[in-house]
Amino acid sequence: MNNARPIRRALLSVSDKTGILEFAKSLHAQGVELLSTGGTARLLADNGVPVIEVSDHTGHPEIMDGRVKTLHPKVHGGILARRGIDELVMEQNNIKPIDLVAVNLYPFAETVAKEGCTLADAVENIDIGGPTMVRSTAKNHKDTTIIVNAHDYDRVIAEMEANQGSTTLETRFDLAIAAFEHTAAYDGMIANYFGTKVPAHSQDECHERSLCAEDSKFPRTYNTQLVKKQDLRYGENSHQTAAFYVDTNIDEASVATAVQLQGKALSYNNIADTDSALECVKEFSEPACVIVKHANPCGVAIGENLLEAYNRAFQTDPTSAFGGIIAFNAELDAETAAAIVERQFVEVIIAPKVCQAARDVVAAKANVRLLECGEWANKTTSLDYKRVNGGLLLQDRDQGMVGLDEVKVVSKRQPTEAEMKDLMFCWKVAKFVKSNAIVYAKNSMTIGVGAGQMSRVYSAKVAGIKAADEGLEVQDSVMASDAFFPFRDGIDAAAAAGISCIIQPGGSIRDEEIIAAADEHGMAMVFTGMRHFRH
């Protein structure tokens, strides 16, 4: 095996000790000499594993409270030496080859995430020697093996056992990629953290006090690392290539973390639409169903159970529901699953959990993509990204949602209790409809959805048309608008359609005129003070 390289000497130095003792014992059993530092060396020695301190190997002690341990020619020369080329130099400088390095880095992310972390705390958790060894070993992957993830220990041991104590070039190259990904992510975290510390140009003798009292939410340069989950057949259109990347630091229930139980591979559009459906259904605590088509909800309802919620959501717009995405906020049962597959063609069904009986029902439609995303307790604070040509827009996720005690009735007429319940339901749906968004609802069920029109009044007209097409009664329905009404024409159109009350953010320079129009029609109007544009 021409590219095999034997492991005779290894350097182990890890902050996360998971699996390192077992790994060291396995290396020792194969005759590998072990070098180590600090806590890792003590752990091995305390458990009877022969180990040589790096300071003994180099003949130079650790200095500066451990800041300098492995930054030495006998370490990096041993790692970077090209086998078959640098032997004479190594002999002249008494450098011994180091064939394997297992390193993970100081816990910078965990440190800065702690409440009360100071800049000094962060600085002391910036690893220097570790990344240097990682990069050196990865650079020389032709001859040396680098491990930065504990889950690779068993893989390397198995390969050594199968190859007379050696690793293959294929494995070393794959591990080198992981190593460069690891150091890139690590440096990115550090750059992001420091980039939020904006100097106040103070002459204060204390460096830490010379930083602004409040950090900037957005660093000077933004670094992130996404991991490819899958290659996609094509992108939004068949002439576009695509792949799906995920943020491994987010553990919130999402399309990115969902497990596919059956069906064809998810497409680009499937993933985007499933995200829209799932994020919408998360807003509801009662059994709810959201049906999405082209990133817009076309039917949303709550019910006593999922079957009722699905039947009511489907009733809103059966035509658009064809080939749609269906999301639930509770365990999918067999009865609801049967109603779906018997009634309509569906691309994706996603729920926190899917019972075995429901799986068996959906299995009859082998192409249907069935996803289980897990329960969601809390939403993760994270950023939204929007790509523009030559740049990237970053913002907080829109996680805002007003409660009953936060809205303000601005009309003369007060909404009834039933109307207020429908208003809050309708407002949650409007948040996930493309702007300009108008949603009609009655009895916790959408009646019509007007999405993406350039004029708000035309979105209202579309919602009315959709309701009429399906024979749904608009009279005494409620209406939600994702942003304020600039003119009274939207109110007049709503009144003509039979809308009884409206929920909207308010904030127009013509608010008084808008409120007067509502009063003129005997409508109730509620302001939320919060807009939900969605583009």
Swiss-Prot record:
Instruction: Please write the reaction equations for the catalytic activity of this protein.
Output: (6R)-10-formyltetrahydrofolate + 5-amino-1-(5-phospho-beta-D-ribosyl)imidazole-4-carboxamide = 5-formamido-1-(5-phospho-D-ribosyl)imidazole-4-carboxamide + (6S)-5,6,7,8-tetrahydrofolate; IMP + H2O = 5-formamido-1-(5-phospho-D-ribosyl)imidazole-4-carboxamide
Family annotation (CDD domains): IMPCH
Q: In which pathway does it act?
A: Purine metabolism; IMP biosynthesis via de novo pathway; 5-formamido-1-(5-phospho-D-ribosyl)imidazole-4-carboxamide from 5-amino-1-(5-phospho-D-ribosyl)imidazole-4-carboxamide (10-formyl THF route): step 1/1; Purine metabolism; IMP biosynthesis via de novo pathway; IMP from 5-formamido-1-(5-phospho-D-ribosyl)imidazole-4-carboxamide: step 1/1
**Single Gene Ontology BP term?**
'de novo' IMP biosynthetic process
Q: Which domain of life is it from?
A: Bacteria
Q: Which GO terms describe its cellular component?
A: cytosol
The residue range of the signal peptide is none
- Which Gene Ontology molecular function entries are recorded, alphabetically? IMP cyclohydrolase activity; phosphoribosylaminoimidazolecarboxamide formyltransferase activity
Which keywords, in A-to-Z order, does the entry hold? Hydrolase, Multifunctional enzyme, Purine biosynthesis, Transferase
Q: Which residues cross the membrane?
A: none
- Record-linked PROSITE patterns: MGS
The record's comment on protein family reads: Belongs to the PurH family.
**Which HAMAP family does this chain map to?**
PurH (MF_00139)
Q: Which PANTHER family match?
A: BIFUNCTIONAL PURINE BIOSYNTHESIS PROTEIN ATIC, BIFUNCTIONAL PURINE BIOSYNTHESIS PROTEIN PURH
Q: What is known of its domains?
A: The IMP cyclohydrolase activity resides in the N-terminal region.
Protein name in UniProt: Bifunctional purine biosynthesis protein PurH
Instruction: Identify the taxonomic lineage of the organism of origin.
Output: Bacteria, Pseudomonadati, Pseudomonadota, Gammaproteobacteria, Alteromonadales
Gene for this chain? purH
